[in-house]
From Swiss-Prot:
GO biological process, one term: regulation of DNA-templated transcription
Cellular compartments annotated: Cytoplasm
GO MF, one annotated term: DNA binding
Designated name of the protein: Probable transcriptional regulatory protein PsycPRwf_1013
Organism of this sequence: Psychrobacter sp. (strain PRwf-1)
NCBIfam families (alphabetical): PRK00110.1, PRK12378.1, YebC/PmpR family DNA-binding transcriptional regulator
PANTHER family attached to this UniProt entry: TRANSCRIPTIONAL REGULATORY PROTEIN YEBC-RELATED, TRANSLATIONAL ACTIVATOR OF CYTOCHROME C OXIDASE 1
Pfam families on file: TACO1_YebC_N (PF20772), Transcrip_reg (PF01709)
GO cellular component, one term: cytosol
Keywords, alphabetical: Cytoplasm, DNA-binding, Transcription, Transcription regulation
HAMAP family on file: Transcrip_reg_TACO1 (MF_00693)
Listed transmembrane segments: none
Amino acid sequence: MAGHSKWANIKHKKAKEDAKRGKIFTKIIRELVSATKQGDPDPESNPRLRAAVEKALSANMTKDTIKRAIERGAGNSDGGEMDELTYEGYGVGGVAVLVETMTDNVNRTVSEVRHAFTKFSGNLGTAGSVAYLFTKRGEIIFDDVSLEDEIMLVALDAGAVDIENDGESLLVITEPDTFGAVKDALDAAGYESSNAEVTMSPSTTALIDNIDDAEKVMKMIDMLEDLDDVQDVHTNVDFTDDVLAQLG
């Protein structure tokens, strides 16, 4: 996808900053609990849980905290019920946005999400309004493009769908249910990824070519991600090189 690397790099940078501030811990714990409730408490047989555990470890969460979250999800400790809901809408410039939430108060969550869209000239839409623009898939990113041939052999043999090279990074694409197996194979072969996740990938992008709109989009995304109930934000935004440079 054109522009993937640019947006992926921004997301990766933001994730590191979020981890430093500590706010990502609450979101990871919720994901650990939810993934356990919806599947096996053993990460080896639950790809979603395994991905959540890897995210937790990369954020330097202690194994004891991870264990307690899994036990809570398995019903071995107290914890209130959480609803998982996805909201859809548009930002300025026709940028499509998917907001994944986990909440114990739906009214509070929808109000906060709508406020973030409205504050930065966006619109919260109805179910299905932008979801069709995204496909769920696994993405594993490597920074060393010189390893393309070696990584391709291992990834495709393990069940990867495709590999993209934009000159700055390699993107290994998988089906959601084979993500864990492909990542395990690459890890076992000694290839360390810079980012790996099952995400919602856009089929088309909305190109932003002016800094004013770009800042509105980024501020809206930041505000959404800062909400306690929001687990993840997916968008089809892309930026021209000039705008990207101005964003820093």
